Structures are given as structure tokens and as C-alpha cells.
Amino acid sequence: MNIILANPRGFCAGVDRAISIVELALEIHGAPIYVRHEVVHNRFVVDGLKAKGAIFVEELDEVPDGAIVIFSAHGVSQAVRHEAKRRELKVFDATCPLVTKVHMQVARASKKGTKAILIGHEGHPEVVGTMGQYDNEKGGIFLVEDVEDIAKLGLKEDEDLTFMTQTTLSIDDTIDVIEALKQKYPAIQGPRKNDICYATTNRQQAVRELAKLAQLVLVVGSKNSSNSNRLAELASRMGTPSQLIDGPQDIDPNWLQGVTTIGITAGASAPEVLVQSVVEHLKTLGVTKVEELEGCEENTVFEVPRELRITEVN
């Protein structure tokens, strides 16, 4: 058997930044540091930060007065920000800048009273935070997950409308939804390019190439990672069996029966160390060759907050 590694794969700039913020806050201020929601959706990463003194909570009422709290890469609603300010919590914001960009689109629509339609997955923390940027009762924000949801909106075709998208969606599915929105609401406005981030786009394109060459695709990523799930779905959609795994412990040897080429990729929140542990485990199961696809180079870097950056330099 041989392995083909997707390229690019694994950590994106937003995830790198979010993890650095937690690690630097712990280094500078000491434990405990509270983090609202998993800073990124990866069990290995979260467990590592817990071991260093990070405490993960779902709501701010779990954070003691005067404590330091970090907002996860997925972003938070305005209500959460107001609550943190009211309680005088020290906040470091690890929201991905590309998510913040979508937040600003929603905030502008809210200020104008323009009704907004968000394409995304209900209940995902990024979606909850993004919808929470809208606070104008004269308008409203509405969520659609697929083309079928559009018929349920009940909005007038000539209304002043705008749309935006979650950053970690399936590119193909999102294009279909946007086209359906434009057909039903010809005057709807939106970004010139959808809001799906560069890392999601690049990793999905890499999986397309991988699925053409492999008989099985393994996606390293946690079950609650949106972008990791989309990678597994895309490989399957292209006709190549796929499995989403947290690490080598999840691999079932039965998956490998009759397989000569295994494709491996990783979601944007999965570290390379997990990919390499999967590779090493597969070598014990008969893999003799490992190669990597050519892919686009990613050089995007997002800086950490100034207070942490200054200390980091010193």
C-alpha cells in the first residue's frame, strides 16, 4: 500500500492565531485562562491546552469576575461581548479575522435595516456568533442551510436583501444556494466572492485531486469540525470512500482490505503531528511508500492581539 498526502492540509492561519493567543495568554498571565467554547474544533488541541491550564466553558456565567477570557476562533455575538464588558472581564479575541469580516457585513446590514440571509449550519458556533451581529428590529437575519430552505423564508421578492455565508461550507453546495437565492430574489446583494475562506477552498480543491487517485480517503479532524466534515463529504461525493478520524486509534484495519492507495488530508483545525501519527500507524499495517501532492502555497499570517504581540517580541 502507498499513501498520498493532500497539499495543503491541516492548520490554517486563523487556527494558528487562535492557539497562539491561548498559549501566549497562559505564558504571560498564568493559569487559569478561560476560553469560551473550544478555541478550535479539535480534541487533541483542546486537550493539550487544558493540560497547560486553559479552562473551556460554554457561557460567560461560568467565568469568575475579573478573570481573563478568550473568545474562540468561531466568534461570538454582540450580546456576549456586551456581557463580558459589563462584567469587566479581560478579553482576548481569537475570532478568525475572516469570520470578523462576515460579522462586519452583518453589522452593516443591521445598521441599514437591510434584511440579511446567512447561508450556514444551524447551531454551529460561527453561525450563532454571526447572526448575533444583527440587532435591528426593523430588519432581520434569516438562516438557510440548503436550497429547500429558501422557499420557507417568506420574504418578498422586491425586498432590500443581502446575503453572506459561513466560512467553512461546501463550495459546491454554497454555489447552488447562492444561485437559488439570486433566482428567487434577483435584486439581492452579496459579496463579490462568497465568504468561504481561502483555507476551506484550498483544502476542498486538494481533496478533489486526492479522491481521483486514492481508493480510500482518511480525513484527520474531529467530529464537530465543520470544515473536516465537508472534506470527508466531498471525497465520498466524488465516489471515493472516506472516513473522518481523530487519529490513528480510529482506524479500522477492515477499511484497508483491497486498498492499494490511501489518501490522507486534515481539516484546518487538525495539527500535522496527528497526520504523521496516522502515517506511522499505517506503516505498521503495510504501507511502504508515502508521497505528497503538489499544491498551492499558503503564506497567510494573522497577528495576535497587540498586548500579546509586544510581549512575544520582547
Swiss-Prot record:
GO terms for molecular function: 4 iron, 4 sulfur cluster binding; 4-hydroxy-3-methylbut-2-enyl diphosphate reductase activity; metal ion binding. The active site is at E126 (proton donor). Its EC number is 1.17.7.4. [4Fe-4S] cluster binds at C12, C96, C197. Pfam families: LYTB. (2E)-4-hydroxy-3-methylbut-2-enyl diphosphate binds at H41, H74, H124, T167, S225, S226, N227, S269. Its cofactor is [4Fe-4S] cluster. It catalyses: isopentenyl diphosphate + 2 oxidized [2Fe-2S]-[ferredoxin] + H2O = (2E)-4-hydroxy-3-methylbut-2-enyl diphosphate + 2 reduced [2Fe-2S]-[ferredoxin] + 2 H(+); dimethylallyl diphosphate + 2 oxidized [2Fe-2S]-[ferredoxin] + H2O = (2E)-4-hydroxy-3-methylbut-2-enyl diphosphate + 2 reduced [2Fe-2S]-[ferredoxin] + 2 H(+). Pathway: Isoprenoid biosynthesis; dimethylallyl diphosphate biosynthesis; dimethylallyl diphosphate from (2E)-4-hydroxy-3-methylbutenyl diphosphate: step 1/1; Isoprenoid biosynthesis; isopentenyl diphosphate biosynthesis via DXP pathway; isopentenyl diphosphate from 1-deoxy-D-xylulose 5-phosphate: step 6/6. It is an enzyme of class 1 (oxidoreductase). Isopentenyl diphosphate binds at H41, H74, H124, S225, S226, N227, S269. It comes from the Bacteria. Binds 1 [4Fe-4S] cluster per subunit. Dimethylallyl diphosphate binds at H41, H74, H124, S225, S226, N227, S269. Keywords: 4Fe-4S, Iron, Iron-sulfur, Isoprene biosynthesis, Metal-binding, Oxidoreductase. One of its GO terms (biological process) is dimethylallyl diphosphate biosynthetic process. PANTHER family: 4-HYDROXY-3-METHYLBUT-2-ENYL DIPHOSPHATE REDUCTASE (PTHR30426:SF0). Belongs to the IspH family. Catalyzes the conversion of 1-hydroxy-2-methyl-2-(E)-butenyl 4-diphosphate (HMBPP) into a mixture of isopentenyl diphosphate (IPP) and dimethylallyl diphosphate (DMAPP). Acts in the terminal step of the DOXP/MEP pathway for isoprenoid precursor biosynthesis. This is 4-hydroxy-3-methylbut-2-enyl diphosphate reductase.
